[in-house]
Amino acid sequence: MKKIIISIALLLVVMANAFAQKGFLRGKVMDTEISEGLIGGNVYIEGTTIGTVTDFNGDYSLPLSEGTYTIVFSSISYNTITVSDVVIVADEVTKLDVNMDTDVQQLEGVEITATALKDSDAAILNVQKKSINTLDGMSSQTFSKVGDSNLSGAIKRVTGVSVEGGKYVYVRGLGDRYTKTTLNGMSIPGLDPDKNSVQIDIFPTAVLDNVMVYKTFSPNLYGDFTGGVVNVETKDFPTEKTTALSLGLSVIPGVQFNNDFILYKGGKTDWLGFDDGGRSLPFNKLASIPDESLVDPQLENLTRSFNPDMGVKKMTAFPSGSLSFSKGNQIDKEHVTLGYNVVLNYQNNYQFFNDFQSNRFRMDADASVNELFKEETRIGTLGKQTVMWSGLVSGAVKFDNHSYSISLLKSQSGESSAAKRVNQNFDDTNATLLEDILTYTQRSVTNGIIIGKHNFDKLQVEWRNAVNVSRVYDPNFRVTTISVSQGEPKLDGGDGAGINRYYRDLNEFNESFKADFTLPYAAQAKFKFGAIGTYKKRDFEIQNYVFDLRGISTISSNPDWFLQPENVWTPDSRTGTYVIGNFEPTNQFNANQNILGSYAMTELYLIPSLRAVFGVRAEKAQMFYTGRNNSGTEVYDNQETLNELNFLPSLNLVYSLSEDMNLRTSFNQTLARPSFKEKSIAQIFDPISRRTFIGNINLEQTNVKNLDLRWEYFMKPGELISVSTFYKLFTNHIELVSYQTNPDNVKPRNAGTSNVYGAEFEVRKNLEFIAPSMKGFSLGTNVSIVKSYVDLNSVFVDDKQQTTEYELRTKNLRDGETIKNTRPMSGQAPYLINAFLNYTMPEGDLSVSLSYNVQGETLAVVGSGLITDVYSVPFHSLSFNAYKSFGANMKSKITVGVDNILNDTKDQVYKGFNAKDQIYATFNPGTQFSVKYNYIF
């Protein structure tokens, strides 16, 4: 027995030693023509039988002993590629990616002697070059260069892409329902009850591999997009074993260690991005709240159960910080390849806005007066703390012609904010109001996706099943407004004073299944078909509570005073503060949506230089709604509110003017559906903007016809010149319209016919052609110019009289003013400009980047009656980022960055005829300085 143990031990030592001498050659073999992985390609050592074949993704892995080799890549009907001087190091992975050209004339093999490592930015351009769609994108390498910590900062550098409110993507000036975001090719729900689009700031760049923005439709894509589809790809497992850790700090002068910074005491788990329960409603939401006149002791108990903190507190803002960790590997077994990837990311950020303000102006009732009348100013300070963490765990197994992968993504964030402002009314009340606002918003997304890929001789099958669970929870939204009259604080409701608490909860479940089939039927021709099913369910409710005061004439201006024990109403005293239930049935609804889709398309060459992709997609959509109005006269119980069957044709043509130059054209039909909230009878009051959203159960979906033309020239790896034009025709375009009689009430309406025209230009160029000393420098810019037109005669501003927006605007013209019968679409930027200047040392251990972004004056809020339009003023964003690698094997890296170098402010202004622009809202985000350290183990 002892000899057996010794023998086994010796065998293990020998095996371990032998394995230690092994290294790996890994990479991907691509078909140059179609930019897809080459299936069944041969990879072997020249002059031997030692080798392997590529899988159906074009990937290969070849274990080799330490040494230098000549590697041969071959496949039937392709030019053979020979790569010399490939060095294999024990226990390390050598990456070698190659592109193979079709050998239609049986040309002789081509030999190269350089290592064909693929650059990530160049790879994105190669995908653009070979794609059947017009698209733009960003790689993880670009994320590193520009230094953005989350997707909302990074994606605005893509041609024609802007970000509204730091969260919402607009493609070609079209946002919300007109831009769709997918995660790993599958639909995901949004995290805002007021928006259709996904809040992209939930995606830290640390977990992302690339982002592709599809600007033209093809039948294999979702039909409900118009501006574009933003597909976010999370990191796949690496080709070699990697472990990395990064730590970051950032400061904004005037935020950190500022004695005036405000917030409030939160919960014990705020640092984890979720509430510990201390902000939850302290009693059952169905509990009956007695009327004060009943002198019921239960009223006192319920009032005292609320957290008494109502005012902001001065606190310390520490430097913002980030922490990320990643670990991944690819493991080769006999006939099986395993892989895994784990990415963890944590961020804690502070913001402080001094002199933050939002105001209300309107036109004078006298048409001879051009200057705008000041109705109300709201000026104060705002402090924020945002905690966000995410975790990505993925694994995959590949064997023969099959692979399976699973990916789990969890993103959690919590945002605390405190605002203290002075509101001054200039209307009939002329009141001065002191306002404290305390909020907490908790957002979470849990995404799981399983992907299977199979190659059955010629037939390729890919299926995906994705499940998403998301929640937006606003517990204990507190607003205390105190009026001041002759220096004395009062709780005068006539002046707009009051005490309110809101509890808002949105839960959404989304499951999608998708199957795609690809069948080649001729040389360079294939037929694709597939199907998809998507189910969405949303539950939404708001609980609203008002506090009143009885029998006390002298109060404090401190919001915490009202719920101090001695100031709470009791049955004996019948004086003090007490709670009033204010639940409105219209603030609660349930809705669901079913979508079944299928498509068929073909891709073929009509002539050697002209590729055509055409087909049709069918989508059947149903929406159901459960809810009621406040009076109970309208009741919906899982009632169908939408039932549409649409056929969406598409034609894409790609003409190769040369090997590196394409001319593209595309014609297709897409659509946009109303959101759950829009297609409802909900009436939801926003205590911050003081606007009431009113749903429209009769809202119809929007149908869009799209025409695109693009010329592109890929000069060298990483270099590009492109020019695009596009046109979009909207039928039943959806606009958020203010009521004629009450501009603070807004309702979504179908706005008839609208048109969008645009052009895009992009150039990326290395500057070595100027002089050899410019090697490593690169310059790039992209510009989008967009014009949109909404027919004012097709937009109705009331329900009964059918008054059009054009009639209402004409009625309120100033003397000498004339208007057109069209205006821009809301949110449509007339131009977008991005520019960058990069320097990267040939060794790649030093990179410096200066980037600039701006978008033109944009219609932000559509005016109504005497309320004029509100426009966003161009914000000039100039950023600097640099990193330096150092240490043993360059495993350490220091990154420094500066954002908003120009210290520009974000402004929105009222615009009137021959009138001075007046501030609607303004704040200064400040200049941020950051430093980050990365280490690769």
For each predicted feature, which ranges?
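Transmembrane beta-barrel wall of Gram-negative outer-membrane proteins
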Residues: 305-419, 443-450, 649-651
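Gram-negative outer-membrane beta-barrel transporters
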Residues: 725-729, 747-858
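Short, acidic Ser/Thr/Gly-rich low-complexity loop/linker segments typical of extracellular
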Residues: 48-59, 696
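Conserved C-terminal beta-signal and adjacent last beta-strands/turns
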Residues: 499-506, 515-521, 526-527, 651, ...
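Surface-exposed extracellular loop regions of Gram-negative outer-membrane beta-barrel proteins
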Residues: 186-187, 421, 471-473, 490, ...
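Outer-membrane beta-barrel signature, preferentially recognizing the C-terminal barrel domain
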Residues: 430-451, 583-596, 642, 671-730, ...
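Short, acidic, small-residue-rich periplasmic hinge/interaction motif at the N-terminus
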Residues: 30, 41-44, 74-76, 89, ...
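Periplasmic N-terminal accessory/gating domains of Gram-negative outer-membrane beta-barrel systems
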Residues: 87, 117-170, 176, 185-203, ...
